[in-house]
Amino acid sequence: MPTVEETQQQCRLALTDPTLAAIASALERRGPGLDQCVTYVADVTERPETVQPLAAIKADLERDGLDLADAQFERYLLTAAALRSLARLDQVPVTDCVRALCCDLYAKLPQRRPRLDLTHHSFAELSKVATLRRFPAGQFDWEPSGLPRSWLLKIRPVGALCQTLHVIAMRMRRFGPAFFVHTGVSGKNYLLLQREAERSYYRMAHSMALQPRVIGLITSSWLHSPDTFAISPHLAWLNRIFRENGAVLATMGPADPGCGVLHRSPERKRAYEEGRLKPTLGLVIWPRDEMLAWARTRPDLEH
């Protein structure tokens, strides 16, 4: 994987490409300028309104006749934002392995990506990585977050709610910050592999050890729901590591069928159409001490 210095060189070189350099010239000529655009990128989340300032700028550039096909505008902004983040990457409390994964992803930002557009969820995900609000760990990423209090009302069964409240009160002592896990933004995760998942958690644990205030790992997805495993038992390993190492497992009510649970799975799609699958969200809460204790037993995941 490239070093920080090598990645900086690659990003700078990419930004001199004539098609991307034309965007820079247009931004400086018309305003608001690149610095303001990078500030907008740092504010992008999954909420549609957060990309509106960038969408307005892009529309202005296109009206002026600039060709922005193949997500040139998006790739330019992400690369420019990543270049600024590289200057402070060494100060971020994550392991060298995670820094290397950041560099690897940053170096690929200028490349064409399918479906990359301001309105596509991948732009929000990559914006977070490019501005150090989300971190790659291999098969999975994480971002600093916490446990929303509103989720407590959704937790089922009641025993899991009681266990969650006990863990928060006695073990975590607060609702955040925590590492919230997502499937990786790198685009290589159509096939989930147990060892790669464990390697991701191992990398997260070692970065968590560098951040004393982080209370643990949290994730919520159809991937962790027992209703998913009833139709796709080959995925049950996804929760095994948590169940065997001190995590709280629960469900949180219905999942949107469009969340991905039916994607690339004829079995789950058929079960849904026949009424045998009612998608639900699984919830995982893995306290810090238990996660770090598990990581200490798995030095085999270092490489």
Task: Describe each region flagged by the PLM.
Residues 185-194, 223-227:
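Short acidic, S/G/P-rich loop/turn micro-motifs used as interaction or catalytic elements
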